[in-house]
């Protein structure tokens, strides 16, 4: 009886055992192995053969080049500038603008906190302001109703 059960299990166990032995000896399953290559003998340190021609910066680009700190004055900016230089200047100005906006956001939050604390000390709240508005609206509606009733009686 055990021989019938043991047969398929033995075959499966043998297969697993062979697989484990292969893993132990080789260290990997040799699937999709790329050949080991060392660093190439002549790495290309030169720029690629193609390069975009010089770019004539607009007035806005010149301002960005100055704001980014690349040039001190407009006169120092050459007639043609590489696109990479203008792109780097735009990125630097973009980052500076983000920092300025973060600072302004933090400043605005602090101003709102201070104004909220002052409103609390004056006993002002949105609920009280809304209640006053609604009471005024009710009075105006009541007054209009009375005026309409008086006009209807007069006619």
Curated annotation (Swiss-Prot):
Keywords from the UniProt entry: Membrane, Transmembrane, Transmembrane helix
InterPro entries linked to this entry: DUF1075 (IPR009432)
Signal peptide residue numbers: none
Membrane topology: Single-pass membrane protein
Keyword Transcription tagged: no
Source species: Danio rerio (Zebrafish)
Similarity remark: Belongs to the UPF0389 family.
GO annotation, biological process: cellular response to hypoxia; neuron apoptotic process; positive regulation of release of cytochrome c from mitochondria
Matches recorded under Pfam families: DUF1075 (PF06388)
Source superkingdom: Eukaryota
Name the record gives this protein: Protein FAM162B
